């Protein structure tokens, strides 16, 4: 997203007030929680809050920039200063969030929409949504059981065989394609009397 005028040109920093971080992008409230940081930080800085929680502050800044700056690509230096342990914690907690909250909300939106759709459109949507949901859950399981242990091993200086990160990239692209297919079905083919708010809910889901 484009930063608002207050944050245009303003860099995230360890010395800034933690309460100011979500001003750049409201989604950073979720980032803060999924890194294991509790609210109620008052006037404390990013560095102070992270130190108290045992979280690498550079990791928070890195993820915040990815959310707040369009097309942001972190430098090698930024990546080296961040904690892989904290990044994996964030990703694991994100899985819990999507399964327990985001997908549950999407389930309810899908079924609420069915009340106004005919049988033909019901079958079309459910086929694509069912495929997307299954793909997401399989993807999360794949990350938890295969990708995260691989990354932990590499981060710990261990060598691994039989798996490469390029395999992860291919798997992740399949998930994105499923979501795009579902969005296209909703936008192009569902009648106007169906719930138009569904596409907005779909737009909030990004893995």
Q: Each predicted region: which residue ranges?
A:
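Small-residue-biased structural context
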Residues: 1-205
């Amino acid at each position: 997203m484009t930063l608002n005028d207050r944050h245009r040109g303003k860099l995230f920093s360890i010395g800034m007030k933690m309460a100011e971080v979500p001003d750049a992008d409201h989604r950073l409230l979720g980032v803060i929680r999924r890194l294991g940081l509790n609210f109620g930080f008052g006037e404390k800085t990013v560095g102070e809050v992270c130190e108290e929680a045992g979280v690498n502050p550079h990791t928070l800044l890195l993820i915040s920039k990815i959310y707040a700056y369009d097309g942001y690509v972190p430098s090698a230096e930024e990546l080296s200063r961040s904690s892989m342990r904290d990044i994996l914690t964030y990703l694991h907690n994100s899985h819990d969030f999507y399964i327990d909250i985001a997908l549950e909300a999407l389930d309810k939106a899908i079924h609420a929409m069915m009340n106004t759709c005919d049988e033909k459109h019901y079958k079309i949507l459910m086929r694509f949504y069912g495929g997307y949901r299954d793909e997401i859950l399989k993807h999360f399981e794949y990350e938890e059981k295969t990708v995260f242990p691989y990354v932990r091993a590499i981060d710990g200086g261990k060598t691994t065989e039989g798996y490469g990160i390029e395999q992860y990239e291919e798997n992740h692209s399949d998930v994105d394609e499923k979501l795009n297919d579902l969005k296209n079905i909703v936008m192009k083919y569902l009648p106007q009397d169906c719930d138009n708010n569904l596409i907005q809910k779909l737009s909030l889901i990004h893995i």
